[in-house]
Structure formats: structure tokens, C-alpha cells
Amino acid sequence: MACSIVQFCYFQDLQAARDFLFPHLREEILSGALRRDPSKSTDWEDDGWGAWEENEPQEPEEEGNTCKTQKTSWLQDCVLSLSPTNDLMVIAREQKAVFLVPKWKYSDKGKEEMQFAVGWSGSLNVEEGECVTSALCIPLASQKRSSTGRPDWTCIVVGFTSGYVRFYTENGVLLLAQLLNEDPVLQLKCRTYEIPRHPGVTEQNEELSILYPAAIVTIDGFSLFQSLRACRNQVAKAAASGNENIQPPPLAYKKWGLQDIDTIIDHASVGIMTLSPFDQMKTASNIGGFNAAIKNSPPAMSQYITVGSNPFTGFFYALEGSTQPLLSHVALAVASKLTSALFNAASGWLGWKSKHEEEAVQKQKPKVEPATPLAVRFGLPDSRRHGESICLSPCNTLAAVTDDFGRVILLDVARGIAIRMWKGYRDAQIGWIQTVEDLHERVPEKADFSPFGNSQGPSRVAQFLVIYAPRRGILEVWSTQQGPRVGAFNVGKHCRLLYPGYKIMGLNNVTSQSWQPQTYQICLVDPVSGSVKTVNVPFHLALSDKKSERAKDMHLVKKLAALLKTKSPNLDLVETEIKELILDIKYPATKKQALESILASERLPFSCLRNITQTLMDTLKSQELESVDEGLLQFCANKLKLLQLYESVSQLNSLDFHLDTPFSDNDLALLLRLDEKELLKLQALLEKYKQENTRTNVRFSDDKDGVLPVKTFLEYLEYEKDVLNIKKISEEEYVALGSFFFWKCLHGESSTEDMCHTLESAGLSPQLLLSLLLSVWLSKEKDILDKPQSICCLHTMLSLLSKMKVAIDETWDSQSVSPWWQQMRTACIQSENNGAALLSAHVGHSVAAQISNNMTEKKFSQTVLGADSEALTDSWEALSLDTEYWKLLLKQLEDCLILQTLLHSKGNTQTSKVSSLQAEPLPRLSVKKLLEGGKGGIADSVAKWIFKQDFSPEVLKLANEERDAENPDEPKEGVNRSFLEVSEMEMDLGAIPDLLHLAYEQFPCSLELDVLHAHCCWEYVVQWNKDPEEARFFVRSIEHLKQIFNAHVQNGIALMMWNTFLVKRFSAATYLMDKVGKSPKDRLCRRDVGMSDTAMTSFLGSCLDLLQILMEADVSRDEIQVPVLDTEDAWLSVEGPISIVELALEQKHIHYPLVEHHSILCSILYAVMRFSLKTVKPLSLFDSKGKNAFFKDLTSIQLLPSGEMDPNFISVRQQFLLKVVSAAVQAQHSATKVKDPTEEATPTPFGKDQDWPALAVDLAHHLQVSEDVVRRHYVGELYNYGVDHLGEEAILQVHDKEVLASQLLVLTGQRLAHALLHTQTKEGMELLARLPPTLCTWLKAMDPQDLQNTEVPIATTAKLVNKVIELLPEKHGQYGLALHLIEAVEAISLPSL
């Protein structure tokens, strides 16, 4: 309870505000960074402050010091103001200003804290050369009745060197501007309404006072409040509509010309005061002499105090009623950001007509009223001393003044004299703190001797002066008037102390009573740490040291704290000393604080704590009842009860207790009311769960379950009206407390009955004990599964708890749900430890059935007394609503356990690369999560597991087919070609197929194969969208999409994928490729599409597959019925988001021609990227209709190209398709020369490559290009690359054989020309001489350089010539040439035979 400094707010980015106000500092930093290392980045936002300060000592010392001072002391050169409600802070310098607003944000440590963030920044000057001299943030009260006490809004008042005072909103919108004097504004101060503390204090009016070099203007607070509200409403209306004209009320102000004083620096407006009769006579004698007349009633006067020079402090008194207040017509100013309509509205307020007249009036300065002269009545003359600032105390009785001699002087305002002086405070900043006494903290024994008579008397008020000495970096708190220093803090040399001296404007004696706004009297802004702090001063520090019992008590508390920290071997001595100290403390609140600190000590043993608390309790009981504080007595009694409970539980846990009864499976079956088959099934499930649930728990050797320090025990529990409750503690702490009570009992090492009796008698409710028991059981799953005997202990414990009073209501009916069992079921539903939850549910069901049977037996026996009735056996179970709920829960937990076991299982497949997305751990399941996950929640969790394991879709299909297989070999017949991959993996899958099969059986509806494939497809595409570089995810997604059998589901999923993830990237890729006119480079792909060039190639290929699937699904969906989505009986109550499959079924039908149109574009893009084609602009292959239809909703009907296409388009398209065919043949057969089968083709990075020639023919059909031209070109390219056997096959598909024969004839000529002319062998030359001249001439005209493969055997060429002869009709012009070629080829082949 000492004086403290508290941090309550931080700055989010104070550096940005500094750089805005001081641009030269940023430039210096930048130039300094460049001087140090030119290669480093010059971006000032990327460098931290530490980086700038790192190399400063290397610079010249003076320059370095100057730079450092500028960087840290910049706040001293700014005008600073903080709203007392902490809603707004203004930092201004010259023409610029930054408005900061508080926001709740999470810090780096995850703690929520308030941070000041920049709300607005800009220039405030209207006239050229004017600068800000003073600023105030005034919160204005809300006029609404339902207001909670927060201000409605905050007005920023700014004074300028031009004499203008301007008023702004929090967003920097200028509301109004007033020129009340033509000299610079020196200081703005505000006074708001305060309820008078007692009748002797004069009620003060609200006002805003403005100090000029030779005048003071005071604006009436009520008038200002009304004007500001009207202006703000007008700005809002004008911004919205622009045609509202309302004349705001005029401002009422008084203007006093201060005389007989040289210079004025600062002022304080004390307010209205009334002199006592003696002071009235004294003043009248001083002014009017011996014969002065005196009025019967003392006149009311407004008092002003100024500081400056000659006199150092001047006192002015203005008689109320001596002058009429002046009325200023409010010249509403409008910020340039608002619309021109707002300017029209403003002109309407002032009666302006035209724009020309408006400009003239704006340029002309308003009329300035003359000041009423006011002479200084008296002062403190000190010719050498110059005052710098004055700060009025909250009670208006004292004022603190600073001067240029480094002194702080305390003035008595009423008497006008200096009553105290502090030395050595140069450049001091001052403020006040007013503290009100808390009546509850008074000593009861002393209440009767108090001057107030009883503890219900009025609260006393204390005033403390706060002085910040920046030269020494110290903040001091002094008790006034003559009190000691009560607090001192080292805060740094570059802070600013802010003392507003006012609260909220617009309150009165009625509204201020209901308002209790959170206001800060004083704040310290620290720019170095970027924090805002306030000072808390307890009232008792104002009491004198010698007489203060509280000061003595605080001394004893400090002594006690020091004693608790010391390590003493003699604990008895320490205990005795602590007892003496706590009994010596007088105040009950302090005594309670001391006892709390003792009980929180870790060094004192339990016996010490018990003895000290018992001693204090005995002492309090021995005193008179009236003088004992009831709260302290109750506190002691409660702590003593807790200590006794701790002792009892510790003793029970330490006893050597063991259950010697043997425990068999048969006993367990009877206990859980299960038959042998059910028990074996349960054990098998739990065994699988244990094997797969391989989570490693970190355990330390000194960690012991069931042990809890007494300090922690006392922190967790509290008594409230004789009922023991648990405080709000974390889950781990809750488990620790439960372990302390029940862990030994669950292990059979402590008496269960004794423990239950002890806890019940201590006041713990059965519901609370059940909650603790279940928290322990469910959190210690690993230990419980390893020790089946603990099930018996849980059964015993649960039975005992259920038999306690108020556990199960006696009036409970079997047809209603028991809250007791519902509590247990809820805990099992919420638990993520499914093994422990399933076991506890079985135990709960067994105990519930036993109790229900007993109750039913009682009722039954009462009904049929005297009659022969069959004895009710344990095997018989009374039917009740609870029983049905238990059975449902057991089924749900069993399902959840199987699912969790599956999700924990891992295959040993060695994938080449594991993505970071796949490495993320899966969340653990609980029944609650599955019930809240919606209908698709189960399939979604399995899909996430499949993604993590990256299984092939065939694995899911294989596990599903095993469901109906008679033997293991049968399903393998139906698996398609990619089964080879599965069979290779199958050896490493382990138990996964069995677990999957079990999950399919358990969830026949939720894990139906189409549903699972749909969720897997969606999961893969979602993960791909997070990291588009992982193209294999998208490929896998398409694989799952292909596996979906139902066309309705397939269509919906594909359409959702396209709209959600693909169309934006697809359109970006299209526009990029169209812009560059070729296959774009990696950098451009990453910039525009967000993935690399190789990933984009795969992306386009997968998009093409997806569009093909969409079209196929649209065709086949009419033949297939819409699937009915069922849910398992146990999971009918699921709630939550709609499943992916349900969303898919809601999708509209696609417009088939539009999808086909997109697939054509996709094929073109894919070809360009796949073969790195150049000089291709994809969109240039389409007319305007075709271009406009792209990237529209695939379900919408668009205007598509129809009819005959422009021949120019067809020509361009044909060239493109021939390019694709050439590139495809080149990619496939360019490596045949090497004859390496592994390099036969260059497949796409992911998946199987397309059949490009067939795709090109298909595209030709859709693009209105002759398909035969493409086929002929394909044949020609095959022969060109020397793949004659494939060429012969391809010839069969060509229709116009004659044209093809002509093309092949040329190719044959090129081959012969290369063989005869370019090899230039002797035999070749001789043969050439024997050839007919026409053939010779034709061969010489051939260019063999066009041939891609010149090493074709002559026998193969001979076959080609024969093929040409077959294709050419005899009447063809080149038939004779072909016959000559046959002879030439035969002649060439003869020498080789």
C-alpha cells in the first residue's frame, strides 16, 4: 500500500509519429545508414532503433550525442495533450499534428493491453506561417439518458501563433475557428464542473480560458458545449446531404486586458470566489483608504493568477457583473476533405451569397472586440525571477509555480503568499493528485475518537504535488502543504508529465452524480519505452508519520515480507516472530494483507501456517465482539478450515492402504454389466487404441501425482457462506487438485470411503467432487489403461458420491433426465481422451443402472407387498430415460474411439517430400467436436488424416472392397492399373486397411466412399491453395474427384472448386500469357499467379482435367439419381456447418458450351506452358464474343461464337495447332537418336502427359480448323523425326491421302538428297550420274536441313516411297517422279545387300 507507478497504455508505433513531426530526424538516420554501409537497404521502416544506435560511438562524440539527444528528447519540443478519460492524445509541432486513439490489442506475449495507435495525422495550419502553440483534448458528455458514463466524443482545441483558436473532431475535421485576439495564443486551460465537497465551497462554472501576451479570454463552458454540439451535428448532416442550414448559438466570452505587468508566460483561472467580511474590509481599506464604503454583501469575483516577470506572480480580480459578456458569431470552418455541398451549407450559416463574395469574406479577418482593462491587484515582486508555469490544485486552494532559477514554489491562492519552496528542479514539470479516504480502512477501535464521530462521517481528501525533474530523470510525490516526500521513481530524462486539471465537459450537479467515468489525474509519457504511466498514491500517506498507525502497520508489513524471504534454520523462532508481527498490526485490512502474504509463502511448512492462523484466530475471538472486524474473523476461520482439510487429506494419502482382492476379467464383466463377448470387443478396441495412441507425455522425475503444496491448495479453494468452492483455475490446476484428492484412491492406495466422508464434511458439493474425479480420470488416460484395477476403484468412488445427499434428487423420476448423470455424460462428451471416456461411461452406466434398479425395486416391493414376486436380479435393468442416454453415449464414444485410433495410425510409406502442411498435427477428437462438426465432420476429419498420410485414392477403394470380399485375393481383380502402386505400398500400410475397414463399418453413411472422396478432394485443394507450389496436392485432388461415382456430387464439387480456388488464378494466368505473348518466366508467374512456372504448367493441366470432368458429369448426371445423404442413428443430433456434399448437391447445372469454351482456352494455355511456345497470344485466337464469355459463372448462359469464323482467325488457329503438334512430336521423339528408353519422353512434372496429337485434332474440331490438315501435319512430323512405324499407323486416320502423298514425296526427296548429295561418297556420286536428269534436278532442289532425323535406314525410306506410290493416283503429276524414286532407292540399297 505504498506509492506506485503503473503502466496502463502503450504506443503501437510512436516512431511513425516522430518521423511525421520531425522529418529531418528520419533523413539523418537514412544518411547515417548510407554512410555506414551503402549496400544496405535505405528503407527506414525496415530498420529498428537498435540498428541506428549500433554504430553511433564510431562517429565524432559531439555529433553522436546531439543525434542521440534529438532521437530521445524530441517529445520535449512538442505540444502534448491527453484527454483525462484516456480517449485521445494529441502530439503537435509547428503546423503538423498526430491524433492517437487507444485500441485493445494483444501484445507479443499474448496479453491483451491498450495501445495508442495513430488515428489521424496532418497539417492544422490554415494561414501561412502560423504554428501550434497549445492544445487541449476536452471530452464532452453524452446527452443520452442511457449513457454509461463514457464521453460522447472528444473535442481537440488548438491555439495558434496567429491568434486563432480552432476546434476539431477526433478525425481532424475542423468544426469552428475563432479569432478573439490578434496576438499569439500562449496557453489554453479548461475547467469542468465538480460537485462542491461541502456547503462552504463556491460552485464553479465550466469555462475555457485562453491566454494572450496581454489578455485573458474566458469562454463560458455551457455556451461552448452547445456550440460544439451544433457544429458537429451540422458537419455530419452536411457531409451526408449538403443542404441542412442551422445557425449555431453564439459563443459567450469575456476578454480582460491585463495591465501593470511586463510579461506573462502562464496563467491559472481560479474561478468565482467570495471574500470573508474581514478580507473585504482589508481590501476596501487598501484600495479606497480609511473612509472607504463597504457593501453589506461581499461581491463575487473571478480570480486569475499569472506568472511571468515584474511581478513574478500577479493576482487579478474581476468583479462579476461589472461587464456584459461579449457574443461571438460562430464562424464555422469546414475541413477541405468534405464535399462542396458542405461549403454551400457553411455559406448558408453565415448568410453568404456568391462564391466571389465568399472568398472575400474568408480573406477578411473577423472583427476583434477590444478588451476590458483589468489592473493587477497585487503580486509577488521579484525582479530577477521569471515564472515559467503555474499549476492549480484540484481543490483550487493551492498552486505550484516553476521558475527559471530551478525552484518550485507552493502558493496559497486565497492569501496570495508563498508557503513552501523546493530547490534544484530546473525545467521541472508539475501536476497534482487528489486522493479521497476510503471509510472502510479506518481503524474500528479509533472510530469513536475520530472528529467525525463515526465511521460513516464524510471522507477526507488529501492533495499531493507531483514533480518531474527531467535533468535528473526522477519523479517525486510530495504531501502538501508541509508534508514529506512520499514517493520517488527513476523514470528517465525524456518523459513528459501531463496534468489536464479537468474532467468531462457538459455535466451538472444532477448528471455528475450518476456518472463515475474512469479518469486519470496525471500521466507520464515515456517515449523511450513507448508507454504511458500513471501514479497511484494511497490516502494514508498524507497522514503525519509520527501519529499514523497505518505508517507503523506498513513498516511491520515490510518487516514481515523481509522475514518471509530469509532462510532461517530455526523455524520455531521465525514462527514466534511472525506471530508477534501480525498481532502488532492494528488495521484489519493490513492484518488481512499480512496473513495472505504468510499463507502464500513457499518457505514456511504446513505446521507453521496452521499455528500462526490458529493464534490469530484465538486472539480475535478473545477480543470484544464490537472491536473485531467481522471480515477478518471470517477470513481467518475460512483459511483455518482449508488448512484442516489439507491436513486430513494428506494424512489419508500417507496411510499404508492396499486392496488385496484379486481382480479378473469375469469380475470386470460383472462390474460393467457386460457379457463376455462385449467385454472382449471393448478390450480389443482399447488395445488397438493404446497401440496407435503413441503421444509422448513429458514427465519429470520429481513430478508426483497426488502431491500438492499447501500454498497452491489455498490458492485453488475458497469458502463462501460455509460452502467450499474452487476458484477459476486452469485445466492443469484443476487436474492437480483432483489428483490430490483422488489419485491414491483410484490406485487403491487410499481408503475411498474415508476420503469421500472427509471431503463431504468439509463442505465440497458432490457435483464439484464428481467434476474433480472425472477431470483426473480423463486426463490420466495412459496410466488408467495400463491398470485395469482402477476401473473397480472408480466404480466404488462413483457409487459413494452418488449416495451423498443432494447428489441424486430423491424425487427423480425414471422418465426424466437426472442432472447428476447428465453432468457425467457431458464430461465424457467433451473429453478428447476417448479411451478413458469410454471406460468412465461404462462405469457410469453400470452405477446408474444399479441405483435405478434399487430405486425401482423399493417402489416395486412397496407396491406388491405380501404377493409372490420374482426377485430382481442384477442382470435385469430398470428402463429409464437415463439408460437410453447412456446407451447412446456408449455408442458415440465407441465410434469416436475407433475414429481416433484410425487418425492416430501412421503408414510407413516413404514419400520423397513431406510438405510442412502435412507435418501439422491433427487435432484430437471428442464426441462434442463430432456433434458440432456438422454432417460432414466425420468425413472431414478422415480426409485431413488421408492428406497428412498422402494415401492414394486406391487405398480407400481397396479397404472399401474388402467389406464384401470373401477372400483377400478377390478385390484385387477389380482394381485398375494404378493398383501396382497400391500393392507396393500395401506391405507398409500395416493395420491401416483393417482400421479403415472398421471405420467404414462403424460409419456406413458418414464414410460412404463418394462422401469420403469428396471431402478428400476438397481438403487437398484447400491445402494446395495455401501453398500453390505443392502442385501434387492439386493433382491428388483431381484424382479423388475422378473417383467420385455419383455425377451430381462430382459436378457440384468440381464447380465449387472452380469458383472458389481456380477461376481467379486461371484468369490471371490467361492475361499474363496474353500480355507477354509466350510462355512466361518464373518471376512473372510468381508475381501475377502466385506460383512458379513449373507449378503453373501442372495447374493448367489439372484445370483441364477438372473441366473435362465437369462436362462428363453434366452428361451422365441425368442418368443417375440424386444421392440421399443419411446419418447413423447415433449421430442424428449433429449440428454445425453444412457439409461439402450437401453444398455440392445445391449447385446449379452448368452451361455445357461455356465449360467447353473454357476447356479449349485451358488446352491452349496448357500447350503453351507445356512446350514453352513463343509468339502466341491465347486470346487472339478468339473473337470478341469468345473473349467476353471467359471467366463468367459456368452456370450462366453466355453469348458464344457461332456460325462461320473469320478466315483470319482460322488461319492463326491452324498455325497454332500445327505448332503444338510439332512441339509434341519433338518432345516425344527428339531423344530416339540416343535410343534410351528412360529418356523417351519428357513427361509433365506431375502425373501422366496428355495425348497431344489427339488433343490437337479435338481442338481443331472446336476451333473450326480442318482436322485433316492437323492429321497430315502429324504424319509429316512423325516421318520427319524418322518414326516411320508410327507414321504408317497415323496415315490411316488421314482422309485426303493425295495431298499427304505429295507432302511425303517431298520428305522422301529430302532424305535421298541427304543420302546422295550431302554424304558425297564415291558410290553415291556414281549413282547420281546414272539417275534421270529430272530426278537429279528435283533432288538438288531439296533442302535436307529441314529433316529432324537424317539417319533413317534406306530400307525404311524404300517403304515410305512404296507407301507414296500406293497413295498417289496414277494420273497425278508427280506419279512419274515417284516411280523414278523407287528405282533410285532400289539402286542405293543394292550395294548394301
From Swiss-Prot:
<feature type="modified residue" description="Phosphothreonine">
    <location>
        <position position="901"/>
    </location>
</feature>
<comment type="subunit">
    <text>The Rab3 GTPase-activating complex is a heterodimer composed of RAB3GAP1 and RAB3GAP2. The Rab3 GTPase-activating complex interacts with DMXL2. Interacts with LMAN1.</text>
</comment>
<keyword id="KW-0898">Cataract</keyword>
<protein>
    <recommendedName>
        <fullName>Rab3 GTPase-activating protein non-catalytic subunit</fullName>
    </recommendedName>
</protein>
<dbReference type="GO" id="GO:0031267">
    <property type="term" value="F:small GTPase binding"/>
</dbReference>
<keyword id="KW-0225">Disease variant</keyword>
<feature type="modified residue" description="Phosphoserine">
    <location>
        <position position="916"/>
    </location>
</feature>
<dbReference type="GO" id="GO:2000786">
    <property type="term" value="P:positive regulation of autophagosome assembly"/>
</dbReference>
<dbReference type="InterPro" id="IPR026059">
    <property type="entry name" value="Rab3GAP2"/>
</dbReference>
<keyword id="KW-0597">Phosphoprotein</keyword>
<feature type="region of interest" description="Disordered">
    <location>
        <begin position="36"/>
        <end position="67"/>
    </location>
</feature>
<comment type="similarity">
    <text>Belongs to the Rab3-GAP regulatory subunit family.</text>
</comment>
<keyword id="KW-0256">Endoplasmic reticulum</keyword>
<comment type="function">
    <text>Regulatory subunit of the Rab3 GTPase-activating (Rab3GAP) complex composed of RAB3GAP1 and RAB3GAP2, which has GTPase-activating protein (GAP) activity towards various Rab3 subfamily members (RAB3A, RAB3B, RAB3C and RAB3D), RAB5A and RAB43, and guanine nucleotide exchange factor (GEF) activity towards RAB18. As part of the Rab3GAP complex, acts as a GAP for Rab3 proteins by converting active RAB3-GTP to the inactive form RAB3-GDP. Rab3 proteins are involved in regulated exocytosis of neurotransmitters and hormones.</text>
</comment>
<keyword id="KW-0963">Cytoplasm</keyword>
<dbReference type="GO" id="GO:0097051">
    <property type="term" value="P:establishment of protein localization to endoplasmic reticulum membrane"/>
</dbReference>
<feature type="modified residue" description="Phosphoserine">
    <location>
        <position position="450"/>
    </location>
</feature>
<dbReference type="GO" id="GO:0005776">
    <property type="term" value="C:autophagosome"/>
</dbReference>
<dbReference type="GO" id="GO:0032991">
    <property type="term" value="C:protein-containing complex"/>
</dbReference>
<dbReference type="GO" id="GO:1903061">
    <property type="term" value="P:positive regulation of protein lipidation"/>
</dbReference>
<dbReference type="InterPro" id="IPR029257">
    <property type="entry name" value="RAB3GAP2_C"/>
</dbReference>
<dbReference type="GO" id="GO:0042734">
    <property type="term" value="C:presynaptic membrane"/>
</dbReference>
<dbReference type="GO" id="GO:0005829">
    <property type="term" value="C:cytosol"/>
</dbReference>
<dbReference type="GO" id="GO:0099536">
    <property type="term" value="P:synaptic signaling"/>
</dbReference>
<feature type="compositionally biased region" description="Acidic residues">
    <location>
        <begin position="44"/>
        <end position="64"/>
    </location>
</feature>
<dbReference type="GO" id="GO:0016236">
    <property type="term" value="P:macroautophagy"/>
</dbReference>
<dbReference type="GO" id="GO:0043087">
    <property type="term" value="P:regulation of GTPase activity"/>
</dbReference>
<dbReference type="GO" id="GO:0005886">
    <property type="term" value="C:plasma membrane"/>
</dbReference>
<feature type="modified residue" description="Phosphoserine">
    <location>
        <position position="978"/>
    </location>
</feature>
<keyword id="KW-0343">GTPase activation</keyword>
<dbReference type="GO" id="GO:0005096">
    <property type="term" value="F:GTPase activator activity"/>
</dbReference>
<dbReference type="GO" id="GO:0008047">
    <property type="term" value="F:enzyme activator activity"/>
</dbReference>
<dbReference type="GO" id="GO:0006886">
    <property type="term" value="P:intracellular protein transport"/>
</dbReference>
<dbReference type="GO" id="GO:0030234">
    <property type="term" value="F:enzyme regulator activity"/>
</dbReference>
<dbReference type="Pfam" id="PF14656">
    <property type="entry name" value="RAB3GAP2_C"/>
</dbReference>
<dbReference type="InterPro" id="IPR032839">
    <property type="entry name" value="RAB3GAP_N"/>
</dbReference>
<feature type="modified residue" description="Phosphoserine">
    <location>
        <position position="39"/>
    </location>
</feature>
<dbReference type="Pfam" id="PF14655">
    <property type="entry name" value="RAB3GAP2_N"/>
</dbReference>
<dbReference type="GO" id="GO:0005789">
    <property type="term" value="C:endoplasmic reticulum membrane"/>
</dbReference>
<dbReference type="GO" id="GO:1903373">
    <property type="term" value="P:positive regulation of endoplasmic reticulum tubular network organization"/>
</dbReference>
<keyword id="KW-0991">Intellectual disability</keyword>
